[in-house]
Every structure is written in structure tokens, then in C-alpha cells.
Amino acid sequence: VTNMHFQIARRGWIGDYVDPNNFLDLFITGGGNNNTGFADPEYDEMILRKAPQAATREERFAVFHEAETLLMEQMPILPVYTYTSKHLVHHSVKGLPPNLMDSLNLKYVWLEDNEQATKTDD
């Protein structure tokens, strides 16, 4: 895929930070993760210059929306599915907050002893 010797290929990307740019940055011309061959100077301008220079969050997101619209009109990719996951967590597990990235950081997780957990459930 990296050498662009394909007619169709399947690729995946899991966001590593919560921001639209995490996905939109994948399609800039010559970008290290742009294995599509997509190249558009207008798109690059929006992602590399306009969005970073936006004065407000709303303005930045409007630029991202415009870039995403351009990307979907040119359709260098065909989104097939999105990753989902569910977690069953025992009631004695504490300190495991949900997060948008669905990453499990177990650093601050602890198990409440069974006696305390049983009292809490009643």
C-alpha cells in the first residue's frame, strides 16, 4: 500500500488524540500516512494553514468541516466501518473513567474489596 501498487486496499486508523485533525491530517499531500495518492492544494491550505491560524475553536472547526466536505466530495477513501468496543466492568472496579478514545489507562484503577462492594450495591 505504501508504494501505491493497488487498485483497492483496506486501511485503518485509530485516533490517538481527540481532535478532528487526527483524521483530516492523514490526507495532506505527501503526508507520511497518506497512502491514497490524494493531493489537493486547497485541502492542504485548509489543514496546514487555515485551521492552525483560526482565531477561535468554532472558526477552526468550520475550516475542518469545509476540508472534510471537500475530502468527501473527492472521495479518496470509502469509509466501510468504524471501530466500536464495549466493556463489562465488575462493580468492584474503581477509578476507570470512560473516555472518548476508548483507551484503558489502568494506572489509577483499583479493586474495592468484596465486603465494601457488596455494601455499595445494596
PLM regions and their residue ranges:
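Detector for C-terminal structural segments
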Residues: V1-D122
